Amino acid sequence: MKNNFSKYQGLGNDFIIFDARSNNLDHLFSKNKDNFIEHLCNRNFGIGADGIILILESNNKCFVRMKIYNSDGSEPEMCGNGIRCLIAFLNDNNEINELSEIPIETKAGLILTYIDGNENIKVNMGEPILSPLDIPTKLLMNSLKVPNGVITLKDQILNVYAASMGNPHMIVFVNDIEGIPFQEWGSFLEKHNTFPNDTNVHFVEIIDKSNIKVKVWERGCGPTLACGTGACACLVVTSKLGKTLNNANVYLPGGKLEVEWPNQSGPVFMQGPALKVFSGEIDI
């Protein structure tokens, strides 16, 4: 059976989007997800993407429900770039019109989104989670109320931090982000037993109080050009540690996200672009 799809990207973090509100795609993906999703996301033998987004009817009075799969078939709780791509898809298909606030249901809960006049998409990412039990992580809370500890990797002792934006993130500060053995460190840390559910890994280089560089190793995907929830988690940790202000530009391999945490007892806001790459149809 042929199904329409659209491919969107947010800073190079790309997704295949299927509108599954009036078909049985959700059932098909749930039943056959592992090999099926890996094939669709394969850049040589499939469409090629970091993940797949299904648009579903919401059961909680939201505009729609977003279901997302990583390229390995796993289902993350939330994806910041993915939700921006979803909003761009809905906007391109004239579903949003004059709505000023678009509530989206996700596995991590209700997420509020907005489109500004330049079609930049702003997302209320909710309050960060810093409780080790809720992230979850075995790291212990330090005096600045951030989970923190050390991990030994061969001859390296890495000082690591943790935060969650509905999904777990490890933050590692480095002096030269291009000089680290990224593949080795990323793959090792993703599966480290300090994080019972595995984790996204972010290597952070501080430029100044308003700008940071981040390199992403995404749980279930490996290297990606950007991670929206990760950018937010990095800003939360850097601001808690006093390394940045409560708003900063986060420079990822795919481009820049603007992240703000105006009140440390409130939500984090992320803003950035999302664009259509192409659309088509595929036999499923």
Curated annotation (Swiss-Prot):
It catalyses: (2S,6S)-2,6-diaminopimelate = meso-2,6-diaminopimelate. It comes from the Bacteria. Its EC number is 5.1.1.7. It holds the Pfam family DAP_epimerase. GO terms for cellular component: cytosol. Keywords: Amino-acid biosynthesis, Cytoplasm, Isomerase, Lysine biosynthesis. Substrate binds at residues 13, 70, 80-81, 167, 200, 218-219, 228-229. One of its GO terms (biological process) is lysine biosynthetic process via diaminopimelate. It is found in: Cytoplasm. Pathway: Amino-acid biosynthesis; L-lysine biosynthesis via DAP pathway; DL-2,6-diaminopimelate from LL-2,6-diaminopimelate: step 1/1. Belongs to the diaminopimelate epimerase family. This is Diaminopimelate epimerase. It comes from Prochlorococcus marinus (strain NATL2A). The gene is dapF.
